[in-house]
Amino acid sequence: MKLIKKLIILVLLTNVISACDAFLAPDKDNIFSESELIKDPSMAEGVLLNAYSNLPNSVNFTEVATDDAVSNDNSNNYRLASTGGWMATNNPFNTWAGSYTNITYINLFLTIVDKVEWSNRSDWQNEHYKERLTAEAYGLRAFYQFRLLQAHAGYDESGNLLGYPIAAGLITVNDDWRSYPRASFDDCVNQILSDLDIAIAGLPDVYADAPNDNTIKADYDKVYGSRFLNRINRRAAQMIKARVLLLAASPAFNPANDLSKWEAAANAAAEVINVNGGLNSLVNNRLEYYLNENNADIIWRKDYTNSRNLETDHFPPSLYGTGRMNPTQNLVDAFPASNGFPISDALSGYNVNAPYTSRDPRLDKYIVYNGGKVKNTTINTIDGAKDGINMVAGSSTRTGYYMKKHMNQNVNLTPGNLISQRHFQTL
């Protein structure tokens, strides 16, 4: 009997210890092997979707670093950069870490895309899924490389025009970055264009459902249908190509003024315009494209969001905003008269006593000036008004002007009656 009791106790202790081991054992982490990724198409696609989730989702007001605008925020990074505070630890133009993180996701995806069964419904779906996702990956990689080129290209101490280290393959933590020196500017441009050519060849013009009489409608919609709206498409890739070529032709990177580069940029831009309907299809009112969900001129944008962040930052203080970005007189004077002549030309008819009348209509749409309106409210920036120069610390204009562009006039910041509105962010 005593032996039986001892055996029972031993079994119970063994079970308790096993239970403790199971309880104390760490759960499986969120890191998956390649073999696990390729078994699950949703998980494999998620690697690429990481690069989508990190696309820019707001407006960067870099004008504060130029003579076109100032900020009333003493800690604004662009203000600091323009006043001697531009450092490696405080670089608002930096896209290095973010771009390479996304390029790494993309390169990882490209190593597995051919190994995944993307659809078991039909061979057509499987092959076209793979083709489209591969093209998306190359298009996104080109986009992030373009951001690197914009932010980090320049001349070294020897006068060589350099770009960024080209990472065309997967780089791991065990790789030595010293084996990836900065490539020449031209090599970077060629790498981006090569990626874009692959993207353009494999992407649809737009994502849209097939007509009902299409014999492969079910298959087509599954791969190229409207549910993929806002993913990179052929037109977006062509648009990026045009911008890359324009950057390469610009005086900053084309000091010899090679006209063939300008020609290439012009031809690429014309191609984008033509595939989007041509010049005659441009929307007549292009002043507020960022407020219109269905503006045909927008080639690629992110999903709209309901928010009031922009208005909170930039409405005048009388409308409960903090008036962060203030256009300068230099920018205001750049808007010509309504007849097209610069206001410095006598033929413009510019009246110094009525400086905002008979001006280019974009002035009223983009900038709040004294006597201008926001939300049908007249804004007074002189005579000691609340919206006047430096009247409210950290909220009032420093120049006599407020920003109006990108603001949704239907947003209400009145305490107790807050109203958010949609904003459409173009890429």
Where are these regions (language model features)?
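Flexible, polar/acidic helix-loop-strand segments at domain edges
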Residues: Y350-T426
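Bacterial Sec-dependent N-terminal signal peptides
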Residues: M1-N30
